[in-house]
């Protein structure tokens, strides 16, 4: 049974509708996680540290796709809610075209200057060659990866979250199989990991292009794009929080790596990489919920349905709070197993990773509220508040904590920086929720 954006959502219906988006995000995060597991265990900790050093740049560059996907889907969903389907398809086609062109330009520039980039991100010695090789191969599929990020949001806006899930599952399974083949069997090393990811990203980014070009029964399909500067700027504004989130995360992750290189050397970077890979999967569930729920919120906001906005807000907050507690408990219980999967071959590195992950996991209790808060205001077409929450959460507070806490607490200050930053962001998010309730009528 297909669930429409216009329906009233019970807990069961809301979770059924959003679950495909959550699974999509989890499988997307698996790309880098599987690479990390195979590289760490089959190639070694130097190669593993190299992937961790270049990953912030690659994820930062792909932020264009998240910005256009989340910001554009909010605007397109609002337009659909207003009953303007033809206009919505024109906007959709324009935004995908812009993402493809922008992705191609960034891919070419990144490929050319990759060696300089990896050195700027802290690579030294033999790590430079590892980083450059992995980065340049990844650039080949960077445009497809951006389109994949765009379509994650637009599949939901089109009323086809299950189809988006199938595409991502296919891409994720491809990545896992090829990692095992290229690294475990053929021993291609770090290049094998990059080729596996490249292939899976082509599947995730290009299959949706084929679908939306063909006749389909979804709410969206490709038409002749007409450039509308106002719509593009509004999309950038709406999606600025997601852009800021990804760019800030890239900068902060690079800062974490630089700090850890000073305090603990290569082992510190490898330990942080293992923690972040697990974090990708855990946080992906919150991101998936936010992505899946945003078009529904935008639709009812565009339709002026205040009662359903209240319903969606209250149910979402309850779900996220409960899930945060579950993730925190799971992280504490599974920390030994998860750490051993990545770095079980080195006793000292394993101990550092285990301790770091348990401290880091405290943030899971509240991180979901902050992610939802930013996405919620994006869905309401209030890009400014969304961007402020995202800017404080992913950049300002984390940078301050990563730079200052280690002065007093050493490496423990690095592990606890995320929790303190999320707590400070929660205070600001709560203030925005309270102050904006009369304007948007969600409380």
Predicted regions and their residues:
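Small-residue-rich hydrophobic transmembrane alpha-helices
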Residues: 48-108, 145-164, 271-335, 367-389
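Short alpha-helical transmembrane segments in multi-pass integral membrane proteins
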Residues: 1-18, 76-143, 185-240, 297-363, ...
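Transmembrane alpha-helix boundary and packing residues in multipass membrane permease domains
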Residues: 21, 25, 37, 41, ...
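Short runs within selected transmembrane alpha-helices of multi-pass transporters and secretion channels
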Residues: 69, 137-156, 167-175, 193-206, ...
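N-terminal transmembrane alpha-helices
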Residues: 6-43, 56-71, 75, 79, ...
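Helix-terminus/linker motif at the lipid-water interface of multi-pass membrane proteins
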Residues: 30-48, 118-125, 181-188, 250-277, ...
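Transmembrane helical elements of multi-pass membrane transporters/channels
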Residues: 16-35, 137, 171, 200-204, ...
